[in-house]
């Protein structure tokens, strides 16, 4: 029977699983976002939140504990100086999982794990200017073509004068 066995095995040996999650949490904290399968994202979330909690503590022992798990010293520094101060008032829940659908190659459910207060770009504001009417687009193209024609003639007129000076 399955009692008190927390965590997912993910079809890997213990050493492989630990190494994979150490690499993933390092990449996640470095880029503040990671795309992976749903099962890995759910496991990575708990590890990443523990690392951010260590960063919030901020003492020497917490720094050493984080450095023992995170593979890159620059990422540990980023965790303690940039990431953790953002969440001083927040008592947990530093990450979110956004499900993307399935991966075409193997039909695996894929999701994005990202930090909650990361800067989000507004999607609707960028979409509205891109949808301009076709008539409005045609007029600037014609005007641009008219402007380019005189510019193209000017260098041609100067070219013979340049040749005459080189012949003389």
Swiss-Prot record:
GO terms for molecular function: structural constituent of ribosome. Pfam families: Ribosomal_L17. PROSITE patterns: RIBOSOMAL_L17. This is Large ribosomal subunit protein bL17. Belongs to the bacterial ribosomal protein bL17 family. InterPro entries: Ribosomal_bL17, Ribosomal_bL17_CS, Ribosomal_bL17_sf. Residues 127-144 have a biased composition (Low complexity). The gene is rplQ. GO terms for cellular component: cytosolic large ribosomal subunit. It comes from Geobacter sp. (strain M21). Part of the 50S ribosomal subunit. Contacts protein L32. Residues 123-144, 149-168 are annotated as: Disordered.
